[in-house]
């Protein structure tokens, strides 16, 4: 298949990279054969208050689960992101911020960021926040979001960031689960030219009678929009900062002390509070950021993720700032007010490294490459992809149109639960194949198993598991350790089950085939939905596709495809048949979609993730009880899809 084409590491990149192929092999081998020795050395990349002597105490036995790293050391995450850079790099720019409107821009040095974080840490203390308390952060993409996170870390409070697109109900469920005393928010946020009513959403969330722990709501004045005010509870950010001291001694925290909670959707629909601790997470976030992106001092690094997702935590805040990087933060969306915005920002800020998501790349593809006619892009050196498997066609478009065919692409696979990147190319070490996450990072031991838990060797396909721990791994589900054990360690004994399927090719490269629940069983044969979607999107008239299974009288499951066509393309029965034949040719007769529904839009969260549970229910004609659609960017998409569904029984 065309997706097997190999993009070789250029000699120039290999010669100047942190790691070439030989060094990768040596380091990886050491990390697996002697993990204690490997991490003993690489744990020193961050600053410790009390140096560790004990490295690793881990077991994936579901009756005796243990995940501990650097566990007799102490440190502070905020000090690692700020204080340790001040002696030599106080004047280096830490954050470049560009607002939704490009006319709004700020630059904040490490010295200034340190002062802001210390002041806000003292402000939090003045509002009763103490070590171990959980603080909910519901903020727009502004520097103050990072300030709030780092201030919590500085005083030993645990932050729980909630994505700014979530509904009041979603906020309430997270506040209730975490028993937050303090919420940090903003009057409004700006996104795509629209004001987002953040404070109003918090007010509505706090009307829930089960929210009983919140004492204070700290409000940043972002737009000056009108907000309701509750005297005694609500307090302005700027008022607190006016009187706060610029000195705040960082708390000495155990390596295994909680750093943050981040809620992710669970299969039951109840959010899971993923808990990450301090020492191992900081080592892993900073190391993966440096090695995966081949980061060099002074470069401008842009991660387009929202701070409300794990990518924003690990690769916009903690990893880059621990490494003394200059981070670009953008308040809006990179295709507003036009698809040219992404390229304009890369050129304007001389971005060296871009880390973005396939959903944005596909959206830009659909608009057409003419929007990049004026794009220079000469500053770009490395490009990354995150969030879902990137289909080969989008990979190539990204490589050609954004990367001008000279930037290596690191297609990274990881999860909220893993804390950092697990499977990825390294720019100077790994020949890449469009659509493949390639090889494991240091210390990561992936394996494929069948449904009975038997390890599959060589070229194969199965359930993706991890055989041993790594420092960035989550430690528990907050308040529900049993759920943690059940979700990740019961399915395959002695292994961490990722929930993803994957195949390993003849070169040992890993290809993520999608969530195991996104596998369709057609006449007894397993088909990854990502594979069928990739085939559809490789057709020049298809902008985006989502594929699910639906009940089929003969085959058990049939293949139902939702297809968004490129702008201006006519939806015809002839094209529908052409696409069916196209997939048949690309993958085989087994993968031919039974039903193709035209879709002007797909149900996505505001981070761009397609909510397939809605698509599965619509395809199965189960349209009366779809569940909560409040997290969708555009809930109206659901009604449109229901009205034009193809599998009606009435």
From Swiss-Prot:
Enzyme class: ligase
In-chain residues carrying the UniProt-annotated modification N6-acetyllysine: 609
Membrane-spanning intervals of the chain: none
Binding positions for ATP per the UniProt entry: 387-389, 411-416, 500, 515, 526
Binding site for CoA: 191-194, 311, 335, 523, 584
One Pfam family cited in the UniProt record for this chain: AMP-binding
Enzyme Commission identifier(s): 6.2.1.1
Entry-linked PROSITE patterns: AMP_BINDING
Keyword Secreted: no
Protein name: Acetyl-coenzyme A synthetase
Species name: Shewanella baltica (strain OS155 / ATCC BAA-1091)
């Amino acid at each position: 298949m065309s997706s097997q084409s190999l993009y070789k590491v250029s000699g120039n990149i290999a010669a100047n990279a942190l790691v070439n192929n030989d060094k990768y092999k040596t380091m990886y081998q050491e990390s697996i054969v002697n993990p204690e020795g490997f991490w003993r050395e690489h744990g020193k990349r961050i600053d410790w208050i009390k140096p560790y002597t004990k490295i690793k105490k881990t077991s994936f036995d579901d009756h005796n689960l243990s995940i501990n790293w650097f566990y007799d050391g102490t440190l502070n995450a905020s000090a690692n992101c700020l204080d340790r850079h001040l002696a030599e790099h106080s004047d280096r720019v830490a954050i470049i911020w560009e607002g939704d409107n490009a006319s709004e821009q700020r630059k904040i040095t490490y010295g200034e960021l340190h002062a802001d974080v210390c002041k806000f840490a003292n402000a939090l203390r003045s509002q009763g926040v103490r070590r171990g308390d959980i603080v909910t952060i519901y903020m727009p993409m502004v520097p103050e979001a990072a300030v709030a996170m780092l201030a919590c870390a500085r005083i030993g409070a645990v932050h729980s960031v909630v994505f700014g697109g979530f509904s009041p109900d979603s906020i309430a469920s997270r506040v209730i689960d975490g028993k937050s005393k303090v919420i940090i928010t903003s009057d409004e946020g700006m996104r795509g030219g629209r004001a987002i009513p953040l404070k109003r959403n918090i007010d509505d969330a706090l009307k829930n009678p089960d929210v009983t722990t919140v004492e204070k709501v700290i409000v940043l004045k972002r737009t000056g929009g009108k907000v309701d005010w509750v005297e005694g509870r609500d307090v302005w950010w700027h008022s607190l900062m006016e009187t706060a001291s610029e000195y705040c001694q960082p708390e000495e925290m155990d390596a295994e002390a909680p750093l943050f909670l981040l809620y992710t959707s669970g299969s039951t629909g109840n959010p899971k509070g993923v808990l990450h601790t301090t020492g191992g997470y900081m080592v892993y976030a900073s190391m993966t950021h440096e090695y995966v992106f081949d980061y060099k001092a002074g470069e401008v690094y842009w991660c387009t993720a929202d701070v409300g997702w794990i990518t924003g935590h690990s690769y916009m805040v903690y990893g880059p700032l621990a490494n003394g990087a200059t981070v670009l933060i953008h308040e809006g969306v990179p295709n507003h007010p036009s698809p040219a915005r992404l390229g304009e920002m890369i050129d304007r800020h001389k971005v060296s490294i871009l880390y973005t998501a396939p959903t944005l790349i596909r959206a830009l593809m659909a608009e057409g490459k003419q929007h990049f006619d004026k794009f220079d892009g000469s500053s770009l050196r490395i490009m990354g992809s995150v969030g879902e498997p990137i289909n080969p066609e989008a990979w190539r478009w990204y490589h050609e149109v954004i990367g001008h065919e000279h930037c290596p692409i690191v297609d990274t696979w990881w999860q909220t639960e893993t804390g950092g990147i697990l499977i990825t190319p390294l720019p100077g070490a790994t020949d890449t194949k469009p659509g493949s996450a390639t090889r494991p990072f240091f210390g990561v031991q992936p394996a494929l198993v069948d449904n009975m838990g038997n390890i599959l060797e060589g070229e194969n396909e199965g359930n993706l598991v991890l055989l041993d721990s790594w420092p960035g791994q989550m430690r528990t589900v907050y308040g529900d350790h049993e759920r943690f054990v059940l979700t990740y360690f019961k399915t395959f004994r002695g292994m961490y089950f990722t929930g993803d399927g994957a195949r390993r090719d003849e070169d040992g490269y890993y290809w993520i085939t999608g969530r195991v629940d996104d596998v369709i069983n057609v006449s007894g044969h397993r088909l990854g939905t990502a594979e069928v979607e990739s085939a559809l999107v490789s057709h020049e008239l298809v902008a985006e596709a989502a594929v699910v299974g639906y009940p089929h009288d003969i085959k058990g499951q049939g293949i139902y495809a939702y297809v968004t066509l490129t702008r201006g393309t006519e939806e015809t029965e002839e094209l529908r048949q052409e696409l069916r034949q196209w997939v048949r040719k690309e993958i085989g007769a087994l993968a031919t979609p039974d039903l193709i529904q035209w879709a002007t839009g797909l149900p996505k969260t505001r981070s761009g993730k397609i909510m397939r549970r809605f698509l599965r229910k619509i395809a199965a004609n189960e349209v009366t009880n779809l569940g909560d659609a409040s997290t969708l960017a555009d809930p109206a998409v659901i009604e449109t899809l229901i009205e034009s569904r193809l599998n009606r029984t009435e």
